[in-house]
Amino acid sequence: MDTNIMGFARALVDLAHEEDKVHLFYDNLKVVFDLVKENQDLMSLMNSQVLSKNQKHEIIDVVFKDHLTQTIVDFLKVVIDNREFFHIKSIIKKFFRMIEEEEHTIFINVVSAHELNDDQKAQLVEKLHKKFASQVKILYQTDPSLIAGIRIQSNDLLIDNSIDGKLKLLKHQLRTFSKEN
């Protein structure tokens, strides 16, 4: 593994502990990871040789300032200044793994179409604890666009048992089938 990736991830883990904001940093970095994963334009801008560091900093401020802690925004700027933004997904993944290993805990996002009751949450915690053989910390969110069902996501896992997810899968399968025939 690139020593820069490890170095940035270790520095971020240390900073998260120093500020006693491990879970907040984890959640913030999940937002960053999801955005850069889905938005190739942002990655292209941050890796551009045409834009100055200040211009890239301004873009980071516009995109993230209202959604992330200042420490994470500043961290992204340091990564840009060191011309390592093309590694940001790897840095964040390494951060996730280091935190999960240290805490012997898997952080999981659970998105459901409707708010889960306490019994449903307890059942989910028990099942996920057994599946991962580890402690789990769950962030619950609701998203009515799922129509019904649930989406479970951790660092390396996505289980989409929502109607929306099944419809998207069906749409993909139909497109693939129509291209083959």
Curated annotation (Swiss-Prot):
PROSITE patterns reported for this sequence: ATPASE_DELTA
A GO cellular component annotation in the UniProt record: plasma membrane
UniProt membrane topology term: Peripheral membrane protein
Gene3D superfamilies registered for this protein in UniProt: N-terminal domain of the delta subunit of the F1F0-ATP synthase (1.10.520.20)
Lineage: superkingdom: Bacteria
GO function term, MF aspect, one: proton-transporting ATP synthase activity, rotational mechanism
UniProt keyword list: ATP synthesis, Cell membrane, CF(1), Hydrogen ion transport, Ion transport, Membrane, Transport
Subcellular localization(s) per the UniProt record: Cell membrane
Pfam families: OSCP
HAMAP family xref list: ATP_synth_delta_bact
Role description: F(1)F(0) ATP synthase produces ATP from ADP in the presence of a proton or sodium gradient. F-type ATPases consist of two structural domains, F(1) containing the extramembraneous catalytic core and F(0) containing the membrane proton channel, linked together by a central stalk and a peripheral stalk. During catalysis, ATP synthesis in the catalytic domain of F(1) is coupled via a rotary mechanism of the central stalk subunits to proton translocation.
Family of this protein: Belongs to the ATPase delta chain family.
Subunit structure: F-type ATPases have 2 components, F(1) - the catalytic core - and F(0) - the membrane proton channel. F(1) has five subunits: alpha(3), beta(3), gamma(1), delta(1), epsilon(1). F(0) has three main subunits: a(1), b(2) and c(10-14). The alpha and beta chains form an alternating ring which encloses part of the gamma chain. F(1) is attached to F(0) by a central stalk formed by the gamma and epsilon chains, while a peripheral stalk is formed by the delta and b chains.
Name by which UniProt lists this protein: ATP synthase subunit delta
Origin organism lineage: Bacteria, Bacillati, Mycoplasmatota, Mycoplasmoidales, Mycoplasmoidaceae
